[in-house]
Amino acid sequence: MENRWQVMIVWQVDRMRINTWKSLVKYHMHISRKARGWFYRHHFESTHPRISSEVHIPLGEARLVITTYWGLNTGEREWHLGQGVSIEWRLKRYSTQVEPGLADQLIHMHYFDCFSESAIRKAILGRVVRPRCNYPAGHKQVGTLQYLALTALVAPKKIKPPLPSVRKLVEDRWNKPQKTRGHRGSHTMNGH
């Protein structure tokens, strides 16, 4: 019988970022109660030696599973130190991997207050708009003009500590696109 390999995307993340993510998840599960229904599985509850933790986030019938790993091969940089994160969407026996932005949107739609189409209509008519969007990380990069006007009208509340964002967890802070000088003096452009 030959070996079967399963390949999955694991985002390389530094250890401190993973620790921050875990503490934010635990805080919002146990203290603020904004993450009601989430399940945190510790490393000693897993049979896999490389899994450091799992966070199960119910999304209706489906669930999002964010798994953190340790002891992986070290990455390109010395600060990676073999830490990583995978993000999976599961429904019954089906599972697929999702990117961090989509994971944030799924969490946002199910767990946090946000504007709706009716809120935009109410604001245009001059009525009071509630609720505020408490989780702006769950929105796409550029919203509609109405949404942008609404966010200017009703600013989100600053929540301390912030809500856990999967996109922030896997964000690469060190490998920003390198700036190079253009052919006209000091103008800069992305060097790809």
UniProtKB/Swiss-Prot annotation:
Residues 172-192 are annotated as: Disordered. Residues 171-172 are annotated as: Membrane association. Induction: Expressed late during infection in a Rev-dependent manner. The record marks L150, T151 as: Cleavage in virion (by viral protease). One of its GO terms (biological process) is viral life cycle. The modification Phosphothreonine is found at T96, T188. The modification Phosphoserine is found at S165. The keyword RNA-binding applies. It is found in: Host cytoplasm; Host cell membrane; Virion. A motif (BC-box-like motif) lies at residues 144-153. Keywords: AIDS, Host cell membrane, Host cytoplasm, Host membrane, Host-virus interaction, Membrane, Metal-binding, Phosphoprotein, RNA-binding, Ubl conjugation, Ubl conjugation pathway, Virion, Zinc. Residues 40-44 are annotated as: Interaction with host APOBEC3G. Residues 75-114 are annotated as: RNA-binding. Residues 54-72 are annotated as: Interaction with host APOBEC3F and APOBEC3G. Zn(2+) binds at H108, C114, C133, H139. Residues 151-180 are annotated as: SOCS box-like. InterPro entries: Vif. A motif (HCCH motif) lies at residues 108-139. It comes from the Viruses. One of its GO terms (molecular function) is metal ion binding. Vif-defective viruses show catastrophic failure in reverse transcription due to APOBEC-induced mutations that initiate a DNA base repair pathway and compromise the structural integrity of the ssDNA. In the absence of Vif, the virion is morphologically abnormal. Belongs to the primate lentivirus group Vif protein family. Counteracts the innate antiviral activity of host APOBEC3F and APOBEC3G by promoting their ubiquitination and degradation. Acts as a substrate recognition component of an E3 ubiquitin-protein ligase complex: mechanistically, Vif hijacks a host cullin-5-RING E3 ubiquitin-protein ligase complex (ECS complex) and the transcription coactivator CBFB/CBF-beta to form an active E3 ubiquitin-protein ligase complex that targets APOBEC3G and APOBEC3F for polyubiquitination, leading to their degradation by the proteasome. The BC-like-box motif mediates the interaction with elongin BC complex. This is Virion infectivity factor. It comes from Human immunodeficiency virus type 1 group M subtype H (isolate 90CF056) (HIV-1). The gene is vif.
